[in-house]
A protein has these predicted regions:
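NAD(P)H dinucleotide-binding glycine-rich loop of Rossmann-like/cofactor-binding domains
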Residues: 1-57
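Short, glycine/polar-rich helix-capping loops at beta-to-alpha or helix-loop-helix junctions
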Residues: 6-8, 82-90, 154-160
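Adenosine-nucleotide cofactor-binding segment
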Residues: 56-59, 71-134
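N-terminal Rossmann-fold NAD(P) dinucleotide-binding loop
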Residues: 63-64
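C-terminal substrate-binding/catalytic core of Rossmann-like NAD(P)-dependent dehydrogenases/reductases
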Residues: 109-112, 116, 152-196
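Helix-to-beta-strand junctions that scaffold the AdoMet/dcAdoMet cofactor pocket
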Residues: 139-141
């Protein structure tokens, strides 16, 4: 990259890349439109069905925004696995039916026992190797694993045979291409919850 990105103090771009925001949108909500656009694109790529239980792994901005979007779109069962008690409480406030602290739940079999079932769809939004391992262990056979966490230097011990033998569909979603208009519209609708 040769120029500062969108999170720089100042940057130069062409007007066609800008999206007008309503004057009534608070700056703290506007700052979340980019991660919201990531969520919008991920939802499109994953072909999510509101009747199917979804588990979100990761209680950062993208995991919490995914929780909010799915809950407001009428998903009946949205659960979240995270590690920060105040964010787990926020996830419930945003619409998660169940939350679990992975520091208390353990891993692998203990995690499956704690949730009492595998999930048809698991969204990995933590960006951590441990989160990826937990996500994979909680996907039901023939289920889908949507990966939107960015791993940087973190490494997951990915179990390819588990994916193969359980016929798990892997879906990666990166960035927010072509999701900005919907994200701006959604931010207007969800701004009270996004400001929490």
């Amino acid at each position: 990259f040769e120029h500062p990105g969108g999170y720089a103090e100042c940057f130069l771009t062409e007007a066609r890349h800008l999206h007008p925001l309503p004057d009534t949108m608070p700056p703290d909500v506007a700052a979340l439109i980019e991660p919201l656009a990531v969520v919008v694109r991920a939802c499109r790529r994953a072909r999510l069905d509101a009747a199917v239980p979804v588990l979100i792994v990761g209680d950062g901005p993208i995991g919490l925004l995914m929780t909010l979007v799915l809950a407001r779109r009428g998903f009946r069962e949205v659960s979240l696995l995270g590690g920060r008690p105040h964010r787990l409480a926020l996830a419930q406030d945003l619409g998660a039916g169940a939350t679990m602290n992975y520091h208390e739940a353990g891993a692998g079999a203990s995690l499956r026992k704690a949730f009492q079932k595998p999930f048809a769809v698991v969204v990995e939004a933590s960006g951590s190797g441990a989160g990826a391992d937990a996500a994979l262990s909680l996907v039901a056979p023939a289920g889908r694993l949507l990966i939107i966490g960015s791993y940087g230097e973190a490494q997951a011990r990915f179990q390819w045979n588990h994916v193969l033998l359980n016929e798990i569909e892997l879906i990666g979603s990166n960035a927010s291409a072509q999701a900005w208009f919907e994200a701006v519209r959604l931010a207007g609708e969800l701004r009270a919850d996004m400001a929490k």
